[in-house]
């Protein structure tokens, strides 16, 4: 069945929170898929995306899987490497929409500040936490090559960890955010998947 696909994300934005060390077809557009797994059939993953469409995503031996688990603001320390989708404030600071904490092995992933489409006007900042003020507005200073951003983290903003995972995480009902390539024939092939563990919804 022919489907319109309305969940395309900027490839550079997705690169901000997913490992990109996967061989890619040079001419395949990069897309993002957000939704819930409805079924697994071997290397085929059936997903109902957030816009309501049903899509089939193919996995390869190179598809990387990360677990997304709950975290707390107290888990973030100076020197932690994080990513945050956020909205701009009039004073030049950012207000976080979500925070994801990378494992040490992924430090440096997507370093920088760029546009993102989690919400209209949002940005993605990936970098190393410098100053961390929890008692006064929960404000993080995130430093990256060429700049830094001050990010205010409201109490209700989801904070998660990205952890090593495997295909055992991929089962019906699991919420996923993935980075994929869409071939000329419409085939979608996952390159990196962030899968919610224990009912967690990846907030990216």
Regions found by a protein language model. Give the residues of each.
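Short, flexible, surface-exposed loop segments at domain boundaries
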Residues: 2-7, 17-204
């Amino acid at each position: 069945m022919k489907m319109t696909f309305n969940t395309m994300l900027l490839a550079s934005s997705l690169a901000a929170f997913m490992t990109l060390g996967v061989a890619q077809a040079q001419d395949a557009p990069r897309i993002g898929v957000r939704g819930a797994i409805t079924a697994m059939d071997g290397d085929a993953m059936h997903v109902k995306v957030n816009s309501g469409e049903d899509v089939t995503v193919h996995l390869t031996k190179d598809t990387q899987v990360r677990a997304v688990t709950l975290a707390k603001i107290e888990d973030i320390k100076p020197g932690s490497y994080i990513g945050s989708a956020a909205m701009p404030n009039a004073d030049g600071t950012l207000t976080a929409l979500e925070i994801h904490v990378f494992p040490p092995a992924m430090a440096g992933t997507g370093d920088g500040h760029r546009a993102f489409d989690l919400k209209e006007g949002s940005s993605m900042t990936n970098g190393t936490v410098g100053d961390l003020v929890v008692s006064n507005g929960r404000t993080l200073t995130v430093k990256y090559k060429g700049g830094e951003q001050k990010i205010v983290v409201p109490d209700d903003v989801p904070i998660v960890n990205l952890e090593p995972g495997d295909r055992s995480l991929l089962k019906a009902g699991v919420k996923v955010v993935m980075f994929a390539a869409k071939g000329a024939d419409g085939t979608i092939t996952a390159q990196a998947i962030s899968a919610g563990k224990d009912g967690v919804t990846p907030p990216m």
